């Protein structure tokens, strides 16, 4: 059965992409604090599972792009290591803020639980599960566990969460183990996308340049929503909303709020 997506949220809904990633390093506590400080109504973030089973907030499967480490008194780029191959303890050796600016030196990779605790119960959260293969059950089950745990300590506004993924199988599995939290399928060119949408797997996320008329007509017919990322321009956001898009994900939500 199709679930209303974030039913208490006003439309169009604005999300900060990986926090406020234009002002602070993406997917860090500093970036999520900006969401709170600026009064952004929603936030999108990404999760990966570590080798030791923790759910951490990071976009890439590797720590190379945003991770830094000190070696012989110098700051160097982290090696091309996958999050899934590193323990939580090993990940603590790396700095995930200084790549953005010296101001954010010392930012560590945050746990999803800690981020959700910081955001509280008033901010809407889109949790994107990052998994590009069939080993999705572990990260899906851990996501469900963390959401269950956070709702025990912050039970207000329980319909503030959304789980999304490019992986349609992960979305199907999450819907199977958790019927209370809505899901979203992020559109690329996966041949099974339309099938999963027809089966009620939530709303549709897509980039503005691939907002296909066929998908737009389908979602409207099925009373589903379409949200777009990444939109940083006011005029583009207004044009998309005019087309029927009800959610905007932006690196610069402070300019669109």
Residue positions per predicted region:
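Phosphate-group recognition and catalysis centered on beta-loop-alpha active-site segments
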Residues: 1-257
